[in-house]
Amino acid sequence: MSSYENHQALDGLTLGKSTDYRDNYDASLLQGVPRSLNRDPLGLTADNLPFHGADIWTLYELSWLNSQGLPQVAVGHVELDYTSVNLIESKSFKLYLNSFNQTRFDTWETVRQTLERDLRACAQGNVSVRLHRLDELEGQPVAHFHGACIDDQDISIDNYQFTTDYLQHAVSGEKQVEETLVSHLLKSNCLITHQPDWGSIQIQYRGRKIDREKLLRYLVSFRHHNEFHEQCVERIFNDILRFCQPETLSVYARYTRRGGLDINPWRSNTDFVPATGRLARQ
């Protein structure tokens, strides 16, 4: 259980509650969650963040009417900057997108600008939005995370409660290495509903070599942990930086979609450019 799971800032969320589905545009449906909820317990404040990054959203169920009433469909790509005051709560995002369904817009650009304006207002930070026609995406191959997969280790695990203990003394040797490690076994639970969130994670670092067994045990310990996707990625980044002390570090997770949305947060303290192709489970 997260230390802020019952925080009053979460009381007003529609997540976990019965809601009506509106199909006429309503920006008030969007709800933000303060990033400070998970950053404060980690000792992180807006002026001392050890990373940069973004939350990348893919919008698969986006539709509206053109000026003549003909339905339009698109796939949306949203990048929400890490410095925003709030992250966007995903159920509210879904409800907000549903409100476009029976709303007329003159142009695709009007839709893009509307999304960008409303998301910026909710997040209180920088947001960029791109809309793709379906034929732009046809034939794109399923992507994969580059790196060494650490999942096929012959180890026994019987503890699935979150702990940072596995990262203590998880580095060895004085030689600096540079490697990229990948796991598809990341599973956490929604902060409010406790529904499972499934993801793949890529960890790039330069520093003393990290013990792969200990790293995998640490990642598996998220299995009963309740936090939003973005919060888990920041926690993982902060924990590895704290206990393993790499010179450079990048953490990037791509989660399976829910409600027509997938969330793909990344955090880094170096020059990192995330690949945005969807993975096999997305």
UniProtKB/Swiss-Prot annotation:
Substrate binds at residues 88-90, 229-230. NADPH binds at residues 90-91, 258-259. It catalyses: 7-aminomethyl-7-carbaguanine + 2 NADP(+) = 7-cyano-7-deazaguanine + 2 NADPH + 3 H(+). SUPFAM superfamilies: Tetrahydrobiopterin biosynthesis enzymes-like (SSF55620). Pathway: tRNA modification; tRNA-queuosine biosynthesis. One of its GO terms (biological process) is tRNA modification. Homodimer. Belongs to the GTP cyclohydrolase I family. QueF type 2 subfamily. This is NADPH-dependent 7-cyano-7-deazaguanine reductase. The lineage of its organism: Bacteria, Pseudomonadati, Pseudomonadota, Gammaproteobacteria, Enterobacterales. The gene is queF.
